[in-house]
Amino acid sequence: MKVVLPDGRIPRRWYNILPDLPEPLAPPLDPETNEPVDPKKLERIFAKELVKQEMSTKRYIKIPEEVRKMYSKIGRPTPLFRATNLEKYLNTPARIYFKFEGATVTGSHKINTALAQAYYAKKEGIERLVTETGAGQWGTALSLAGALMGIKVRVYMARASYEQKPYRKVLMRIYGAEVFPSPSENTEIGKRFLSENPNHPGSLGIAISEAIEDVLKDEKARYSLGSVLNHVLMHQTVIGLEAKQQMEEFEEPDVIIGCVGGGSNFAGLAYPFVKEVLDGDNEYEFIAVEPKAAPSMTRGVYTYDFGDSGELTPKLKMHTLGHRYHVPPIHAGGLRYHGVAPTLSVLVNNGIVKPIAYHQTEVFEAAALFAKLEGIVPAPESAHAIKATIDKAIEAKREGKEIVILFNLSGHGLLDLHGYEEYLEGRLQDYEPKDLPISNPLNPKP
C-alpha cells in the first residue's frame, strides 16, 4: 500500500515554525560581544537570502518555481508506504506508515535544502559552496545541487565516515565536488585537531569549523549547512506537507517519529503536524530518536553553546553535550553532532517532543529486520526511527491500542553496507558516555 502524489501537489510554500513556537526563540549570540548577532555579519558566511529566511517570522515562505521544478526532477513528491509486513510480523494492532525520502536521486532528504541553498547562492553570484558532511548524505546532495546550478562544491567529511563509507566520497566526486577527510591539513583548525590526535575520527562539529574557516579565506565562497539552523529545517518541511496530503488517503497519525542528529529530517516530517498541536487543532505524540553515543537531547544541557568545535559560529541556545565533546565513531555518521536545532530544543524543553536514545547494535538489528520484511535497506540514521517505531508498535500490542504510527525513513543505506557487515559479523561496538551531563559547555573542564 502506497500513495504517490502527482507533481502538481509538490508544496508551493515552506512552513516556518518560528512564529508558532510556544516561546520566542533565543537569538544567536555574537561570540565576541555576547549580544545578538548582527545579520550583516552572517552574510559573510551564508547567502543573503538564507540569512533573511533564518531571521524571518513569516509563517510561510514561497518556494521558487525553479526549485519546485528541480524537486520534481530529483524525485519529489516521495512515496508514502504502509509497512504491512512489519505489522504482521509484530502481530500488532498498530498501523505503521513511512515517508520514504530514500527515493530521491541522492538517496535521502538532504537534497530538499541543498537545491534551495544552491539556487539562492547562484542568484547572488556565489561561485563556490563549502560544507561539512557526516555520513555523506548531505555532502552528496550539495554536490549534485552545485552541479545542477554550476557552482563549485568543497566537502569536509568526518574522517570516521570518510573511511567507513568510501563510495560516498566517490559519488560526491562523480557530481564534481572536492572531498577531504576532516580534520584535514587544509585548515588551521584541522591541523590543531590532528596535532592532538593524528588518527582523529573527526565529527560534524570539526567539519563545520573547517568549512567556515575555508569560506572566510575566499570572498566568492559561502558556507552551506545541512541541518540545525531554521532555514534548513524550513526547507525540509516539504516532507511533512506532502505526508499530510498522503495520509489523507489513509488516516490521521497518532504518533510521528524521526531520528535526530541536528534535527532537519525530524523537523521536515514533524513540524507541519506540530503546527496543528500548537494551534490547538489536534493532538499527536512526537518522538525524536538519537544515538546513545551522542545523547544531546536525553543527557545534554539546554544552554548556549557554539555550533562547531572550532568556535567560529555564533552561540546557539540548544540541547548540547558541549562543542568539545568527542563523538564516538558510530556508523550513523549523520547523528554524530554535539547539539541539536534550537527550534527543536524549544519543543523538547516544552514537552511537545519526547526524546529517546538507542545503542547502535539494537538499531542495526531493527534495520536488518525491516530490510527483510519491507525490502528497503535503511540508512543507519533512519534506522533509529525504525527501532522506535517497532518499540511503539509492541507497546500498542501490549496495551491493546489501535494506534497509527508515521515515521520518516530519511534515506537508504545502500552505501552504508560496511556497518551492516559489522553487525552481521558481531563486530559492532556500543558507546555510551559516562561523564554526562556537563555543567558548562562553554567552559568544560579539561
UniProtKB/Swiss-Prot annotation:
First-level EC class: lyase
Signal peptide: none
Catalytic reactions of this protein: (1S,2R)-1-C-(indol-3-yl)glycerol 3-phosphate + L-serine = D-glyceraldehyde 3-phosphate + L-tryptophan + H2O
Cofactor(s) listed in the protein's UniProt record: pyridoxal 5'-phosphate
NCBIfam families named among the record's database cross-references: PRK12391.1, trpB_rel
Taxonomic classification: Archaea, Methanobacteriati, Methanobacteriota, Thermococci, Thermococcales
GO CC annotations, alphabetized: cytoplasm
PROSITE patterns: TRP_SYNTHASE_BETA
PANTHER family: TRYPTOPHAN SYNTHASE (PTHR48077:SF6), TRYPTOPHAN SYNTHASE-RELATED (PTHR48077)
This protein's encoding gene: trpB2
EC number from the UniProt entry: 4.2.1.20
Pathway given in the UniProt record: Amino-acid biosynthesis; L-tryptophan biosynthesis; L-tryptophan from chorismate: step 5/5
Record key words, sorted: Amino-acid biosynthesis, Aromatic amino acid biosynthesis, Lyase, Pyridoxal phosphate, Tryptophan biosynthesis
Subunit structure: Tetramer of two alpha and two beta chains.
N6-(pyridoxal phosphate)lysine found at: K110
Gene Ontology molecular function, alphabetical: L-serine hydro-lyase (adding indole, L-tryptophan-forming) activity; pyridoxal phosphate binding; tryptophan synthase activity
Cross-referenced Gene3D superfamilies: 3.40.50.1100
Protein source organism: Pyrococcus furiosus (strain ATCC 43587 / DSM 3638 / JCM 8422 / Vc1)
Family per record: Belongs to the TrpB family.
Biological role stated in the UniProt entry: The beta subunit is responsible for the synthesis of L-tryptophan from indole and L-serine.
Annotated protein name in UniProt: Tryptophan synthase beta chain 2
